[in-house]
Amino acid sequence: LKASMTVNSAGKSLIKLYTDRDGLFHNGINAELAGIELRDWLVLSPFAPPIDGTLSGNAKINFNEQYYWGDCCIRVDRMSYGKKLVGNLDLDAKLAMTDDATKTYALADMELDGKEIMTLRGMKNDSLPTSECNLDIAIKRLPLSRASAFLPDGTGDMSGYLNGAMKLRGPEANPSINGSLQFDTAQQRIQNYGSALTFDGRRIPVDNGRVRFDSYELRGANGNPITLNGYVDLSMDVDKIYSDIKLKGRNVQVINGKKRGRVELYGKGFVDINGAVKGYANNLDMRASVSILAGTNLTYVCQTSSVALTEGADEGVVKFVNFSDTTRHAADSLAAQPYAMRIKAALIVQPNAVFNVNLSPDGKDKVQIDGEGMLSYSQND
């Protein structure tokens, strides 16, 4: 096998593919990359993730009479996801496979901004009737502020670090997973709602695929916890992941924010909460009761003015149809659901809980609610 190809663009980016012979091994296949702007390539696909950064690296694949092996070093400078900075990412990986393709060995290290955050060591054995894996993964002070870039919009930002270690053993299709995860000074903040929860620093054990929560605490702004007990079983297929979790909290301050910028919700909010989630991922039972306590004083700001809300409000409110006109019948809009979810929830507002609603961002039009009541909601599937 021989190759010699070089592609460059105005001296800024380079793609090079070539072979060489060093006298010891058969021809090796080499690849070099430099100055590749990811956004210029990913824009070619409408399904590509919103990743940006400058890609560079090199890779080599080689073989002899006993092994095929390869190693690569890849770097993405100023990597971002959805316009949120992740950092400078480095991946160093090595892979080897026996000539009969019965055993594969892997080793990988990942760094973020020059600090090691993850390692992988393992092998796969295909010489048995069912493929067996032996894999060790370690997470070392992964900065959650950078990982927040991958969270969906509206879920807030995280701070602190994540540590962990996992061992995967047994059949490749359904390995046994054991290890633990541990947050270090971690907090989840949703700035637009003045909400913050601090994660417990204790280990979260994973035993045979079960992620266990033993009185695990998420603390509100006043230090009072929401306590989780139960487990999530990851030992099955994705749609068969089974959960059995109960959560309970008393006088937890879930909102503690000040009026500023385009914040939608601010003030102080205190709740009692009881909840439970049980069942498979595609067939869940959820129960929850949330009491908004006295002492709560919240202000919600409509970011759209009341004038804009009323414009066109009378359009499409009433539509007259002729039921005998079969030519205008539309197809059923109710598609079969891939999963079922049963929900039973109650929201209780206690006396002396105050709510203010600013109908315009400047606060000139507003409503104040000082009352009590209960709202129930249920869903069968």
Enumerate the language-model features and the residues they cover:
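Interface amphipathic segments
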Residues: 1-165, 173-273, 280-374, 380-381
